[in-house]
Swiss-Prot record:
The lineage of its organism: Bacteria, Pseudomonadati, Pseudomonadota, Gammaproteobacteria, Enterobacterales. It is a peripheral membrane protein. The complex is composed of two ATP-binding proteins (ProV), two transmembrane proteins (ProW) and a solute-binding protein (ProX). The gene is proV. ATP binds at G61, L62, S63, G64, S65, G66, K67, S68. Belongs to the ABC transporter superfamily. This is Glycine betaine/proline betaine transport system ATP-binding protein ProV. It comes from Salmonella typhimurium (strain LT2 / SGSC1412 / ATCC 700720). InterPro entries: AAA+_ATPase, ABC_osmolyte_uptake_ATP-bind, ABC_transporter-like_ATP-bd, ABC_transporter-like_CS, CBS_dom, CBS_dom_sf, Gly-betaine_transp_ATP-bd, P-loop_NTPase. GO terms for molecular function: ATP binding; ATP hydrolysis activity. Induction: Induced in response to increased extracellular osmolarity, this is the first gene of the proU operon (proV-proW-proX). Osmoregulation requires curved DNA downstream of the transcription start site in this gene, which is repressed when bound by H-NS. H-NS may act indirectly to influence the local topology of the promoter.
Protein backbone atom coordinates (compact mmCIF):
# COMPACT_ATOMS: atom_id res chain seq x y z
CA UNK A 1 0.00 0.00 0.00
CA UNK A 2 1.28 3.48 -0.91
CA UNK A 3 2.20 5.96 1.82
CA UNK A 4 -0.33 8.82 1.76
CA UNK A 5 0.76 10.87 4.76
CA UNK A 6 4.20 10.83 6.33
CA UNK A 7 5.72 12.60 9.30
CA UNK A 8 9.52 12.74 9.62
CA UNK A 9 11.37 13.85 12.76
CA UNK A 10 8.62 16.31 13.63
CA UNK A 11 8.89 18.75 16.53
CA UNK A 12 6.53 21.34 17.94
CA UNK A 13 7.80 23.56 20.74
CA UNK A 14 5.48 26.23 22.13
CA UNK A 15 6.84 29.57 23.33
CA UNK A 16 9.17 32.36 22.22
CA UNK A 17 12.43 31.39 20.51
CA UNK A 18 11.66 27.66 20.51
CA UNK A 19 15.07 26.75 19.08
CA UNK A 20 16.46 27.29 22.61
CA UNK A 21 14.95 23.97 23.63
CA UNK A 22 16.96 21.78 21.27
CA UNK A 23 20.20 21.85 23.25
CA UNK A 24 18.29 20.52 26.26
CA UNK A 25 16.49 17.92 24.15
CA UNK A 26 19.88 16.71 22.89
CA UNK A 27 21.07 16.42 26.49
CA UNK A 28 18.11 14.14 27.22
CA UNK A 29 16.16 16.46 29.55
CA UNK A 30 12.51 15.62 30.10
CA UNK A 31 9.56 17.70 28.97
CA UNK A 32 9.11 19.00 32.53
CA UNK A 33 12.78 19.89 32.93
CA UNK A 34 12.80 21.80 29.64
CA UNK A 35 9.71 23.73 30.72
CA UNK A 36 11.37 24.58 34.05
CA UNK A 37 14.62 25.78 32.44
CA UNK A 38 13.24 27.65 29.41
CA UNK A 39 9.52 28.22 29.87
CA UNK A 40 9.05 26.34 26.58
CA UNK A 41 6.51 23.55 26.25
CA UNK A 42 7.44 20.50 24.20
CA UNK A 43 4.30 19.48 22.30
CA UNK A 44 5.67 16.93 19.84
CA UNK A 45 9.17 15.45 19.98
CA UNK A 46 10.95 13.80 17.05
CA UNK A 47 7.80 12.07 15.78
CA UNK A 48 7.92 9.90 12.67
CA UNK A 49 4.90 8.13 11.17
CA UNK A 50 4.05 6.61 7.80
CA UNK A 51 0.29 6.40 7.21
CA UNK A 52 -0.89 4.23 4.35
CA UNK A 53 -3.47 5.21 1.78
CA UNK A 54 -6.92 3.94 2.73
CA UNK A 55 -6.22 3.02 6.36
CA UNK A 56 -7.82 4.22 9.58
CA UNK A 57 -4.85 5.27 11.70
CA UNK A 58 -5.62 5.99 15.35
CA UNK A 59 -3.37 8.18 17.51
CA UNK A 60 -3.84 7.58 21.24
CA UNK A 61 -2.41 8.95 24.44
CA UNK A 62 -3.26 10.44 27.80
CA UNK A 63 -4.11 14.12 28.19
CA UNK A 64 -0.99 16.14 27.39
CA UNK A 65 0.63 13.37 25.36
CA UNK A 66 0.68 15.50 22.19
CA UNK A 67 -1.96 13.71 20.13
CA UNK A 68 -4.15 16.78 19.44
CA UNK A 69 -1.06 18.86 18.66
CA UNK A 70 0.04 16.16 16.25
CA UNK A 71 -3.20 16.15 14.27
CA UNK A 72 -3.09 19.95 13.92
CA UNK A 73 0.43 19.71 12.55
CA UNK A 74 -0.83 17.39 9.81
CA UNK A 75 -2.81 20.19 8.13
CA UNK A 76 -0.63 23.05 9.43
CA UNK A 77 -3.25 24.52 11.73
CA UNK A 78 -0.15 24.60 13.94
CA UNK A 79 3.21 25.38 12.35
CA UNK A 80 5.93 22.78 13.03
CA UNK A 81 9.14 23.89 14.73
CA UNK A 82 11.23 21.34 12.87
CA UNK A 83 10.65 18.30 10.65
CA UNK A 84 8.50 17.34 7.70
CA UNK A 85 4.81 16.64 7.03
CA UNK A 86 4.49 15.00 3.62
CA UNK A 87 1.20 14.55 1.76
CA UNK A 88 1.72 12.51 -1.40
CA UNK A 89 5.43 13.22 -0.98
CA UNK A 90 5.04 17.03 -0.79
CA UNK A 91 6.23 18.73 2.41
CA UNK A 92 3.35 21.02 3.38
CA UNK A 93 5.61 22.79 5.90
CA UNK A 94 7.39 24.38 2.93
CA UNK A 95 4.52 25.30 0.60
CA UNK A 96 3.06 28.80 0.25
CA UNK A 97 -0.13 29.95 1.98
CA UNK A 98 -1.98 29.82 -1.35
CA UNK A 99 -0.82 26.25 -1.95
CA UNK A 100 -1.78 25.31 1.61
CA UNK A 101 -5.31 26.67 1.10
CA UNK A 102 -5.59 24.52 -2.03
CA UNK A 103 -4.47 21.44 -0.09
CA UNK A 104 -7.11 22.12 2.58
CA UNK A 105 -9.77 22.69 -0.07
CA UNK A 106 -9.12 19.51 -2.03
CA UNK A 107 -7.01 17.00 -0.13
CA UNK A 108 -7.54 17.21 3.61
CA UNK A 109 -10.50 17.93 5.88
CA UNK A 110 -11.00 17.89 9.64
CA UNK A 111 -13.80 16.94 12.03
CA UNK A 112 -13.59 18.38 15.55
CA UNK A 113 -15.09 17.22 18.84
CA UNK A 114 -17.31 20.31 18.91
CA UNK A 115 -20.07 20.23 16.29
CA UNK A 116 -19.67 24.00 15.68
CA UNK A 117 -22.87 24.25 13.63
CA UNK A 118 -24.41 27.62 12.81
CA UNK A 119 -27.81 27.65 14.59
CA UNK A 120 -29.43 30.00 12.06
CA UNK A 121 -28.43 27.87 9.06
CA UNK A 122 -30.09 24.71 7.75
CA UNK A 123 -28.32 21.37 7.77
CA UNK A 124 -27.68 21.76 4.03
CA UNK A 125 -26.22 25.25 4.44
CA UNK A 126 -24.08 24.13 7.38
CA UNK A 127 -22.73 21.27 5.29
CA UNK A 128 -21.93 23.63 2.42
CA UNK A 129 -20.51 26.41 4.62
CA UNK A 130 -16.84 25.55 4.14
CA UNK A 131 -17.30 25.40 0.39
CA UNK A 132 -19.04 28.78 0.47
CA UNK A 133 -16.03 30.31 2.24
CA UNK A 134 -13.81 28.71 -0.39
CA UNK A 135 -15.74 30.48 -3.14
CA UNK A 136 -17.34 27.41 -4.73
CA UNK A 137 -20.41 28.22 -6.85
CA UNK A 138 -23.82 27.83 -5.18
CA UNK A 139 -25.13 25.00 -7.38
CA UNK A 140 -21.93 22.97 -7.10
CA UNK A 141 -21.71 23.29 -3.33
CA UNK A 142 -25.40 22.38 -2.98
CA UNK A 143 -24.89 19.19 -5.00
CA UNK A 144 -21.77 18.24 -3.07
CA UNK A 145 -23.43 18.99 0.28
CA UNK A 146 -26.47 16.85 -0.60
CA UNK A 147 -24.22 13.98 -1.66
CA UNK A 148 -22.32 14.22 1.64
CA UNK A 149 -25.58 14.22 3.60
CA UNK A 150 -26.66 11.11 1.71
CA UNK A 151 -23.42 9.41 2.74
CA UNK A 152 -24.20 9.97 6.43
CA UNK A 153 -27.92 9.22 6.11
CA UNK A 154 -29.22 12.77 6.65
CA UNK A 155 -30.54 13.70 3.20
CA UNK A 156 -34.09 13.90 4.59
CA UNK A 157 -32.94 16.49 7.15
CA UNK A 158 -31.31 18.85 4.65
CA UNK A 159 -33.75 21.68 5.43
CA UNK A 160 -33.91 21.12 9.20
CA UNK A 161 -32.05 23.30 11.71
CA UNK A 162 -29.42 22.11 14.23
CA UNK A 163 -31.74 22.46 17.24
CA UNK A 164 -34.07 19.91 15.62
CA UNK A 165 -31.35 17.24 15.60
CA UNK A 166 -29.99 14.85 18.22
CA UNK A 167 -26.34 15.00 19.28
CA UNK A 168 -25.46 12.09 17.02
CA UNK A 169 -27.20 13.70 14.07
CA UNK A 170 -25.40 17.00 14.65
CA UNK A 171 -22.07 15.18 14.63
CA UNK A 172 -23.11 13.53 11.36
CA UNK A 173 -23.55 17.03 9.92
CA UNK A 174 -20.02 17.86 11.06
CA UNK A 175 -18.79 14.72 9.33
CA UNK A 176 -20.79 15.54 6.18
CA UNK A 177 -19.25 19.02 6.09
CA UNK A 178 -15.80 17.43 5.96
CA UNK A 179 -16.87 14.80 3.41
CA UNK A 180 -18.42 17.43 1.12
CA UNK A 181 -15.05 18.38 -0.35
CA UNK A 182 -14.38 14.67 -1.02
CA UNK A 183 -11.00 14.76 0.75
CA UNK A 184 -8.26 12.19 0.31
CA UNK A 185 -7.41 12.56 4.01
CA UNK A 186 -9.84 12.98 6.90
CA UNK A 187 -8.54 14.16 10.29
CA UNK A 188 -10.83 13.46 13.25
CA UNK A 189 -9.91 14.94 16.64
CA UNK A 190 -11.87 12.99 19.28
CA UNK A 191 -14.84 13.49 16.98
CA UNK A 192 -17.17 11.13 18.87
CA UNK A 193 -16.01 11.60 22.46
CA UNK A 194 -18.77 14.09 23.39
CA UNK A 195 -21.52 11.66 22.38
CA UNK A 196 -23.44 9.24 24.57
CA UNK A 197 -21.93 5.72 24.53
CA UNK A 198 -24.70 4.21 22.39
CA UNK A 199 -24.54 7.02 19.82
CA UNK A 200 -20.74 6.89 19.87
CA UNK A 201 -20.81 3.20 18.93
CA UNK A 202 -23.33 3.97 16.20
CA UNK A 203 -21.04 6.66 14.76
CA UNK A 204 -18.05 4.32 14.89
CA UNK A 205 -20.03 1.78 12.88
CA UNK A 206 -21.04 4.51 10.44
CA UNK A 207 -17.42 5.53 9.95
CA UNK A 208 -16.37 1.93 9.27
CA UNK A 209 -19.18 1.56 6.70
CA UNK A 210 -18.18 4.79 4.96
CA UNK A 211 -14.57 3.64 4.92
CA UNK A 212 -15.53 0.34 3.30
CA UNK A 213 -17.16 2.29 0.46
CA UNK A 214 -14.71 5.15 -0.08
CA UNK A 215 -11.34 4.03 1.33
CA UNK A 216 -10.14 7.43 2.51
CA UNK A 217 -7.05 7.86 4.62
CA UNK A 218 -8.35 8.65 8.12
CA UNK A 219 -6.31 9.87 11.08
CA UNK A 220 -8.44 9.48 14.20
CA UNK A 221 -7.44 10.96 17.56
CA UNK A 222 -8.84 9.15 20.59
CA UNK A 223 -8.24 8.50 24.28
CA UNK A 224 -10.75 5.62 24.23
CA UNK A 225 -9.04 2.24 23.86
CA UNK A 226 -12.26 0.42 22.93
CA UNK A 227 -12.84 2.95 20.16
CA UNK A 228 -9.28 2.59 18.86
CA UNK A 229 -9.51 -1.21 18.82
CA UNK A 230 -12.92 -1.09 17.16
CA UNK A 231 -12.07 1.15 14.21
CA UNK A 232 -8.27 1.31 13.87
CA UNK A 233 -6.25 -0.60 11.30
CA UNK A 234 -3.15 0.58 13.17
CA UNK A 235 -2.61 2.54 16.38
CA UNK A 236 0.15 4.96 17.41
CA UNK A 237 0.64 5.52 21.14
CA UNK A 238 2.00 8.92 22.24
CA UNK A 239 3.67 9.74 25.56
CA UNK A 240 5.08 13.16 26.52
CA UNK A 241 5.08 14.28 22.89
CA UNK A 242 6.81 11.16 21.57
CA UNK A 243 5.44 8.31 19.48
CA UNK A 244 6.41 5.31 21.60
CA UNK A 245 4.79 2.51 19.59
CA UNK A 246 2.99 1.92 16.28
CA UNK A 247 1.27 -1.31 15.29
CA UNK A 248 -1.96 -3.18 14.77
CA UNK A 249 -4.11 -3.63 17.89
CA UNK A 250 -3.00 -7.24 18.34
CA UNK A 251 0.69 -6.40 17.71
CA UNK A 252 0.61 -3.81 20.48
CA UNK A 253 -1.43 -6.03 22.76
CA UNK A 254 1.02 -8.91 22.34
CA UNK A 255 4.22 -6.83 22.49
CA UNK A 256 3.74 -3.54 24.39
CA UNK A 257 6.79 -1.28 24.03
CA UNK A 258 6.91 -0.11 27.66
CA UNK A 259 4.96 0.05 30.92
CA UNK A 260 3.00 3.10 29.71
CA UNK A 261 1.66 1.15 26.72
CA UNK A 262 1.14 -1.94 28.86
CA UNK A 263 -0.98 0.11 31.27
CA UNK A 264 -3.12 1.34 28.38
CA UNK A 265 -3.90 -2.22 27.34
CA UNK A 266 -4.21 -3.76 30.79
CA UNK A 267 -7.51 -5.52 31.22
CA UNK A 268 -8.34 -5.52 27.52
CA UNK A 269 -10.72 -8.35 26.70
CA UNK A 270 -8.80 -10.07 23.92
CA UNK A 271 -11.89 -12.10 23.05
CA UNK A 272 -13.20 -8.83 21.61
CA UNK A 273 -9.91 -7.90 19.92
CA UNK A 274 -8.88 -11.10 18.17
CA UNK A 275 -10.96 -12.85 15.55
CA UNK A 276 -11.01 -16.41 14.21
CA UNK A 277 -8.44 -15.64 11.50
CA UNK A 278 -5.91 -14.55 14.14
CA UNK A 279 -5.71 -17.97 15.80
CA UNK A 280 -6.73 -20.37 13.01
CA UNK A 281 -3.99 -22.91 12.28
CA UNK A 282 -3.22 -23.67 8.65
CA UNK A 283 -1.83 -27.20 8.75
CA UNK A 284 -1.49 -29.84 6.02
CA UNK A 285 -2.50 -32.47 8.57
CA UNK A 286 -6.07 -33.55 7.91
CA UNK A 287 -6.28 -31.44 4.76
CA UNK A 288 -7.74 -33.25 1.76
CA UNK A 289 -7.33 -31.69 -1.68
CA UNK A 290 -10.20 -32.64 -3.95
CA UNK A 291 -8.84 -33.71 -7.35
CA UNK A 292 -10.18 -36.12 -9.99
CA UNK A 293 -7.87 -38.92 -8.83
CA UNK A 294 -8.35 -38.48 -5.09
CA UNK A 295 -11.36 -40.42 -3.80
CA UNK A 296 -12.66 -41.77 -0.48
CA UNK A 297 -10.08 -44.57 -0.34
CA UNK A 298 -7.15 -42.14 -0.66
CA UNK A 299 -8.75 -39.75 1.83
CA UNK A 300 -9.34 -42.57 4.32
CA UNK A 301 -5.72 -43.72 4.09
CA UNK A 302 -4.50 -40.13 4.56
CA UNK A 303 -6.53 -39.68 7.76
CA UNK A 304 -5.53 -43.10 9.13
CA UNK A 305 -1.84 -42.43 8.42
CA UNK A 306 -2.10 -39.08 10.19
CA UNK A 307 -4.16 -40.57 13.04
CA UNK A 308 -6.98 -38.08 12.43
CA UNK A 309 -10.70 -38.71 12.92
CA UNK A 310 -11.79 -35.83 10.67
CA UNK A 311 -10.52 -34.19 7.48
CA UNK A 312 -11.15 -30.88 5.73
CA UNK A 313 -11.77 -30.97 1.99
CA UNK A 314 -10.65 -28.11 -0.26
CA UNK A 315 -10.55 -27.76 -4.03
CA UNK A 316 -8.69 -25.62 -6.56
CA UNK A 317 -8.27 -22.00 -5.50
CA UNK A 318 -8.24 -23.08 -1.83
CA UNK A 319 -12.06 -23.13 -1.81
CA UNK A 320 -13.50 -24.90 1.21
CA UNK A 321 -15.71 -27.88 0.27
CA UNK A 322 -16.61 -29.54 3.55
CA UNK A 323 -15.73 -31.94 6.38
CA UNK A 324 -15.37 -35.72 6.21
CA UNK A 325 -14.75 -38.33 8.91
CA UNK A 326 -13.32 -41.84 9.05
CA UNK A 327 -16.87 -43.19 9.39
CA UNK A 328 -18.33 -41.12 6.54
CA UNK A 329 -15.48 -42.13 4.20
CA UNK A 330 -15.98 -45.83 5.04
CA UNK A 331 -19.70 -45.47 4.35
CA UNK A 332 -19.03 -43.84 0.97
CA UNK A 333 -16.56 -46.62 0.10
CA UNK A 334 -19.03 -49.36 1.04
CA UNK A 335 -21.49 -47.94 -1.48
CA UNK A 336 -18.83 -47.24 -4.14
CA UNK A 337 -19.56 -43.51 -4.02
CA UNK A 338 -17.30 -40.49 -4.51
CA UNK A 339 -15.87 -38.18 -1.88
CA UNK A 340 -18.90 -35.86 -2.17
CA UNK A 341 -21.02 -38.60 -0.57
CA UNK A 342 -18.69 -38.63 2.43
CA UNK A 343 -19.20 -34.94 3.24
CA UNK A 344 -20.85 -34.46 6.63
CA UNK A 345 -24.19 -32.63 6.51
CA UNK A 346 -24.21 -29.05 7.83
CA UNK A 347 -20.79 -28.95 9.52
CA UNK A 348 -20.04 -25.96 11.73
CA UNK A 349 -18.00 -23.41 9.74
CA UNK A 350 -17.02 -19.99 11.11
CA UNK A 351 -16.23 -16.75 9.33
CA UNK A 352 -12.66 -15.48 9.63
CA UNK A 353 -13.86 -12.18 11.15
CA UNK A 354 -15.84 -13.80 13.99
CA UNK A 355 -14.64 -12.45 17.39
CA UNK A 356 -13.24 -15.04 19.77
CA UNK A 357 -15.99 -14.14 22.25
CA UNK A 358 -18.54 -15.66 19.86
CA UNK A 359 -16.53 -18.81 19.18
CA UNK A 360 -16.45 -20.45 22.60
CA UNK A 361 -19.93 -22.00 22.57
CA UNK A 362 -19.61 -23.10 18.93
CA UNK A 363 -16.17 -24.67 19.20
CA UNK A 364 -17.05 -26.27 22.53
CA UNK A 365 -20.00 -28.14 21.02
CA UNK A 366 -18.33 -29.18 17.76
CA UNK A 367 -17.19 -32.82 17.44
CA UNK A 368 -13.99 -31.74 15.68
CA UNK A 369 -11.79 -28.69 15.13
CA UNK A 370 -13.86 -26.01 13.42
CA UNK A 371 -12.91 -24.88 9.88
CA UNK A 372 -12.50 -21.14 9.29
CA UNK A 373 -13.28 -19.51 5.92
CA UNK A 374 -12.98 -15.97 4.57
CA UNK A 375 -15.60 -13.87 2.76
CA UNK A 376 -14.85 -15.73 -0.51
CA UNK A 377 -15.27 -19.10 1.22
CA UNK A 378 -11.56 -19.82 0.99
CA UNK A 379 -10.08 -22.08 3.63
CA UNK A 380 -8.16 -20.15 6.32
CA UNK A 381 -7.46 -22.94 8.81
CA UNK A 382 -8.98 -24.72 11.80
CA UNK A 383 -9.62 -23.89 15.45
CA UNK A 384 -9.73 -26.63 18.09
CA UNK A 385 -10.98 -26.33 21.68
CA UNK A 386 -7.39 -26.39 22.93
CA UNK A 387 -6.26 -23.66 20.52
CA UNK A 388 -9.14 -21.40 21.53
CA UNK A 389 -8.55 -21.87 25.26
CA UNK A 390 -4.82 -21.16 24.83
CA UNK A 391 -5.62 -17.95 22.93
CA UNK A 392 -8.06 -16.79 25.59
CA UNK A 393 -5.56 -17.64 28.32
CA UNK A 394 -3.10 -15.13 26.81
CA UNK A 395 -5.20 -12.34 28.34
CA UNK A 396 -3.96 -13.27 31.78
CA UNK A 397 -0.36 -13.66 30.66
CA UNK A 398 -0.14 -10.35 28.83
CA UNK A 399 -2.21 -8.13 31.04
CA UNK A 400 -1.93 -9.58 34.49
Amino acid sequence: MAIKLEVKNLYKIFGEHPQRAFKYIEKGLSKEQILEKTGLSLGVKDASLAIEEGEIFVIMGLSGSGKSTMVRLLNRLIEPTRGQVLIDGVDIAKISDAELREVRRKKIAMVFQSFALMPHMTVLDNTAFGMELAGIAAQERREKALDALRQVGLENYAHAYPDELSGGMRQRVGLARALAINPDILLMDEAFSALDPLIRTEMQDELVKLQAKHQRTIVFISHDLDEAMRIGDRIAIMQNGEVVQVGTPDEILNNPANDYVRTFFRGVDISQVFSAKDIARRSPVGLIRKTPGFGPRSALKLLQDEDREYGYVIERGNKFVGVVSIDSLKAALSQAQGIEAALIDDPLVVDAQTPLSELLSHVGQAPCAVPVVDEEHQYVGIISKRMLLQALDREGGNNG
